[in-house]
A protein has these predicted regions:
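C-terminal functional extensions of proteins
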Residues: 107-162
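A short, glycine/acidic-enriched catalytic loop
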Residues: 45-63
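Short beta->alpha junction loops
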Residues: 12-19
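Proline-aspartate-enriched helix->loop->beta-strand connector
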Residues: 28-42, 100
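Short glycine-rich, flexible loops that bind phosphorylated cofactors or substrates
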Residues: 44-45, 112
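Short helix-loop-beta junction
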Residues: 2-11
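Short acidic active-site motifs
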Residues: 20-24, 91
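Catalytic cores of nucleophile-dependent amide-cleaving enzymes
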Residues: 64-111
Length: 162
């Protein structure tokens, strides 16, 4: 619904987190998108635990593996893919290290389900000559930089010359 209102072409697949690493490659091959959102449900299993231990997260390991599979697809098919990955309280640093351009949640907070969509829309409508950073997006996000951050990406919109 959000993408239809924005007049963006999108495909939405509801895939359980544990299956995402196994499904993402073939979906990328079939749909050949410019932007990929890997999300679902996540959370820290013990809030007083070490932030940097993958075993302390419900589903971050699956998102990380899905990002790696997406980057493998990108290398094999010479694709330039922008990836958002993560959910509430996800292991942000590992998602970025795996290859996500934007991820949640640097402050290990809950994010609104619409926030990854806002990031994807901003990438989609920004000219491909402009490099977007979280500084270009965070004011539109409910939780700002605490919920989502990243290394950035070039926009995907193309200029049309007549």
């Amino acid at each position: 619904m959000y993408y239809k209102k924005s007049k963006l072409n999108s495909v939405v697949k509801n895939i359980p987190e544990y299956r995402q690493p196994k499904e993402v490659y073939k979906l990328l091959f079939f749909y050949n998108p410019d932007i990929l959102i890997i999300t679902g449900h996540d959370g820290m299993l013990n809030k007083e635990s070490n932030y940097y231990n993958i075993d302390n997260y419900r589903n971050s390991k699956y998102f990380i593996e899905a990002v790696k599979e997406a980057r493998r697809y990108e290398r094999e098919y010479f694709k330039s893919l922008v990836i958002f990955a993560g959910a509430c309280q996800s292991y942000y640093e590992a998602l970025i290290s795996a290859g996500a351009n934007f991820a949640s949640s640097p402050s290990r907070i809950l994010i609104d389900f619409i926030e990854p969509l806002i990031v994807a829309k901003k990438v989609a409508v920004t000219n491909n000559e402009k490099y977007l950073t979280i500084d270009d997006i965070y004011k539109e996000l409910k939780n700002g930089k605490g919920g989502i951050s990243g290394i950035g990406a070039y926009g995907k919109a193309q200029k049309i010359l007549l």
